[in-house]
A protein has these predicted regions:
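Catalytic palm subdomain of template-directed nucleic-acid polymerases
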Residues: 262-279, 352-374
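Short amphipathic alpha-helical coiled-coil/interface segments
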Residues: 7-26, 147
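Catalytic-core region of right-hand nucleic acid polymerases
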Residues: 159, 194, 210, 263-287
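Short, conserved micro-motifs composed of acidic
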Residues: 110, 304-306, 379-381
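Mobile genetic element proteins and their domesticated derivatives, centered on retroelements
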Residues: 18, 88, 120, 124, ...
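Active-site palm subdomain of RNA-directed nucleic acid polymerases
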Residues: 209-223, 324-357
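Surface-exposed loop/turn segments and immediately adjacent short secondary-structure elements
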Residues: 36-190, 196, 200
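Conserved catalytic palm subdomain of right-hand nucleotidyl-transferase polymerases, strongest
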Residues: 65, 130-138, 187-197, 234-274
Length: 381
C-alpha cells in the first residue's frame, strides 16, 4: 500500500466528503421523519419509535449477560448459553403435581374427509407475511407466490400426512427466542417468555387441522380467549353487569381472580389427549396432533449464540397456530366442574375469575386446580 503524503491527503479529503454526505443524508431523513410525525398518520410512527427505544434497553438481543438460578451474573458466552438451555429445558419438561386420572373416556372412531383445496386456500389466506421463519428457512410467501401450484402441492402433501399420521421430521425442530415480558429484572430468565420459530409449512398444516377442530368442538360461552368475535372487553362488560345486578339486589357476590402459573408451558400431554377425546374429537385427529408433539426438539437463540438442542416433552408449542385452540379445549374441560358449581365463572385463556354467592364455594372451586395440575401464580392472583 502506497503511504505517500499525496495519498494520505487524498484519503483524508475523501473521508471529509463521505462525512458531509452522510450528515446531509441524516439531516434529510430526520426532516422527512419530523414532517411525517406532524401528520395524523405519523402518530403511529411516534408511538412505535417510543416503544422501540424502550425495548432496545430490555431486548434479549442487547442483553449479553444473564443470572444463574442463585442470582450470580454469568458473563462468558458458554455459561450464558448453558443457563438459557437449563432454564427452558427445565420449564418445558416439568409438570405440576396433579392427581392422575383414573376414569377412561371413549374414543370417537370415525372416518375423516380428505383435505380439500379450498381448506388450504383459506389457511394460506390466514397466514401473515413478513414473519420470522423456522429452521427450514421457507417463508409462507413462497407458497403464496406459487399460487394454485402451491395449493395443489400442499393439498397432496397434507393428505399424505393425514393418511399416514406422520409429518416430515424437519417440522419437529424449532428455534426458541426469549422475549422479555417488560417487567422485572432484564437479566433474569424467568422474566422472559419463549416463542418458538417453527416451519411455516407446518403452521399451514396446523391451521387446516384447527379449522376442522373448531367445527366439531364446542367451547363454553364463558371462554373469551382465542375465540372468534370475543375479547377482553366482552368479559369485562359481562362481569360489570353481574356485579351491578348483585349490588342492586343488595346481595353478596364473591369473586376471585386467578392467574395460572406457566399454564401454557406445563399442560401435561396426557391431559391434552384426554380433553380432546372428551370434547368429541375424532381419534384420527387426536393421533395427528399427537404426531405434531412427538420427538419435538428445540434450541434457544440468544444474544451470544445458539444453545445445544434439547427435547420438549411437556406443554403446548409457543408460537404454534394450533396451540391456542388446544389450550381452549383443555381449559374448557378442566373448568367444567367449576362452571357447574359457579355458573358465572369467566375465562380469558388462563386468566380465570370465579364468582359465587358464598366464599366457601369460591374456596372449594379453587381446590379443583390442585387436582387438575394447574398451579396458581400467587403474585398475580
Amino acid at each position: 500500500m502506497d503511504r505517500s503524503k499525496e495519498n494520505r491527503q487524498e484519503y483524508k479529503e475523501s473521508q471529509r466528503r463521505v462525512k458531509r454526505e452522510v450528515s446531509k443524508a441524516k439531516q434529510k431523513a430526520y426532516d422527512e421523519l419530523y414532517t411525517r410525525l406532524d401528520t395524523r398518520e405519523g402518530e403511529k410512527d411516534l408511538y412505535r419509535l417510543a416503544r422501540q427505544r424502550d425495548r432496545d434497553g430490555k431486548d434479549v438481543q442487547q442483553v449479553r449477560v444473564i443470572k444463574d438460578r442463585d442470582g450470580r451474573v454469568l458473563t462468558s458466552e458458554e455459561s450464558v448459553q448453558r443457563r438459557w438451555k437449563e432454564y427452558f429445558e427445565e420449564l418445558m419438561n416439568e409438570e405440576n403435581e396433579r392427581e392422575k386420572r383414573v376414569e377412561g373416556v371413549n374414543s370417537v372412531e370415525q372416518k375423516v374427509d380428505k383435505i380439500r383445496k379450498d381448506e388450504v386456500r383459506k389457511a394460506l389466506k390466514r397466514m401473515k407475511s413478513g414473519k420470522a421463519v423456522g429452521p427450514d428457512d421457507i417463508p409462507v410467501e413462497v407458497w403464496k407466490c406459487l399460487g394454485e401450484a402451491a395449493v395443489e402441492f400442499l393439498t397432496s402433501l397434507f393428505n399424505r400426512i393425514l393418511e399416514s399420521e406422520r409429518m416430515p421430521g424437519e417440522w419437529r425442530r424449532s428455534v426458541l427466542v426469549p422475549i422479555f415480558k417488560n417487567k422485572g429484572d432484564v437479566q433474569s430468565c424467568s422474566n422472559y417468555r419463549g416463542i418458538k420459530l417453527m416451519s411455516h409449512t407446518m403452521k399451514l398444516w396446523e391451521r387446516v387441522v384447527e379449522a376442522r377442530l373448531r367445527k366439531v368442538v364446542e367451547i363454553c360461552e364463558q371462554q373469551y380467549g382465542f375465540m372468534p368475535r370475543k375479547s377482553t372487553t366482552d368479559a369485562i362488560f359481562a362481569l360489570r353487569i353481574l356485579m351491578e345486578k348483585y349490588r342492586d339486589g343488595q346481595r353478596e357476590l364473591h369473586c376471585v381472580f386467578v392467574d395460572l402459573e406457566k399454564a401454557y408451558d406445563r399442560v401435561p400431554r396426557e391431559e391434552m389427549w384426554y380433553c380432546m377425546r372428551k370434547s368429541g374429537v375424532a381419534e384420527k385427529y387426536v393421533r395427528v396432533v399427537q404426531d405434531m408433539y412427538e420427538r419435538s426438539r428445540t434450541v434457544v437463540r440468544c444474544a451470544v449464540g445458539q444453545t445445544k438442542e434439547f427435547n420438549v416433552e411437556v406443554g403446548l408449542h409457543q408460537g404454534s397456530a394450533l396451540s391456542p385452540f388446544l389450550f381452549a379445549i383443555v381449559m374448557d374441560q378442566l373448568s367444567e366442574e367449576d362452571r357447574q358449581e359457579s355458573p358465572w365463572t369467566m375465562m380469558f385463556a388462563d386468566d380465570i375469575v370465579i364468582c359465587s354467592e358464598s366464599r366457601e364455594q369460591v374456596e372449594e372451586n379453587l381446590e379443583v386446580e390442585v387436582c387438575t395440575g394447574e398451579k396458581r401464580n400467587e403474585s398475580q392472583s
